[in-house]
């Protein structure tokens, strides 16, 4: 308990938060039981820290080998979790694996026996096939945003990774949607479901609570001009524009660029270095507009 308290104090300090929220506290408490966990929570609720604290509390310096595996649906989420881990888990060897990243660099890092691996299903499965990732010592498995992993078509890769894992002691599955049934390969043991979808206290808020939603109907041929008028009239700060196709992202960006508006494109057809460069510009406010596909 003393080690867990120290972990919590360090996490709060390094992440600049005063204390854990209700969901994070309940996750820590529930994780002490032998049951697997299904965590249902909305975006922006502190879910990442909620599952990372129990994961880190189970890692032992006496064990050589991979003790925890976190599977996520996207490169950006893998990098986001890796960034949090770097702040709260100093001294623990961590490797982040995802498509578009150098396989050679990942292979070198994996050869030094990491305790924790974060990655996307396709890249993790590939490393396992090639013998670069061995999960004989795995204690904890996290399936983060599991619903999105399935929606993106990763069921085969996830089954390939998870089905052979018979000795995992703790599985944590997170999702933004509630489902009565799960694929058999998840093989959860007497799972406890923690449902935080729409159950926040009156004084608890998330980033989405600060958003206002408006709808503007426009003929397809006038959409770009309507968007341009909105940007000129509203003069917004940081702005995310979502499109449903990569080609649409590129078309909208070119339209705005031709009219003197700086904007970054962000989609799965771009090289990883270009994606990271676009995000960096958006984060440091050198570009105030980012145009993205909803699954990028």
Q: Which functions belong to the PLM regions below?
A:
Residues 40-43, 73, 244:
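P-loop (Walker A) phosphate-binding loop of NTP-binding proteins
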Residues 25-37, 48-63, 79, 84-88:
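Walker A/P-loop NTP-binding motif
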Residues 134-204:
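Post-DEXD/H (motif II) to motif III coupling segment of the RecA-like Helicase ATP-binding lobe
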Residues 33-39, 64-68, 114-115, 169-170, ...:
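Pre-Walker A (Motif I) flank of P-loop NTPase domains
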Residues 1-40:
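Conserved pre-motif I regulatory segment
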